[in-house]
Amino acid sequence: MNSAHPCCDPVTCKPKRGEHCISGPCCRNCKFLSPGTICKKARGDDMNDYCTGISSDCPRNRIKK
């Protein structure tokens, strides 16, 4: 990760104080996206996947039953 990233502490390259995340499908402008924000659209047998609001990662694929 580039230490010049605006969300990144230049010494530790962890999120700066008051910021939640540096990157990821559920991270924008150093903050987690709101719960329910689509991070991966449905395709084939998959269903939409949604951000949780507490992580920068997109949850694992949900499959239609």
UniProtKB/Swiss-Prot annotation:
- GO cellular component terms given for this protein: extracellular region
Q: Where is this protein localized, as stated in its record?
A: Secreted
Q: Which UniProt keywords apply?
A: Cell adhesion, Cell adhesion impairing toxin, Disulfide bond, Secreted, Toxin
**Primary location:** secreted
Question: What Gene3D superfamilies does the record point to?
Answer: Disintegrin domain (4.10.70.10)
- Tell me where on the tree of life, at the top rank, the source sits: Eukaryota
List the disulfide bonds in this chain: 7-30, 21-27, 26-51, 39-58
Where is the short sequence motif Cell attachment site located? 43-45
One GO term under biological process is: cell adhesion
Q: Name one GO molecular function term.
A: toxin activity
Expressed, tissue-wise, as follows: Expressed by the venom gland.
Pfam family, any one? Disintegrin
Function, as annotated, reads:
Inhibits integrins alpha-IIb/beta-3 (ITGA2B/ITGB3), alpha-V/beta-3 (ITGAV/ITGB3), and alpha-5/beta-1 (ITGA5/ITGB1).
* PANTHER family hit by this protein: ADAM A DISINTEGRIN AND METALLOPROTEASE DOMAIN, ADAM METALLOPROTEASE
What does the annotation say about its assembly with partners? Heterodimer with CC8B; disulfide-linked.
**What is the name of this protein?**
Disintegrin CC8A
**What is the scientific name of the source organism?**
Cerastes cerastes
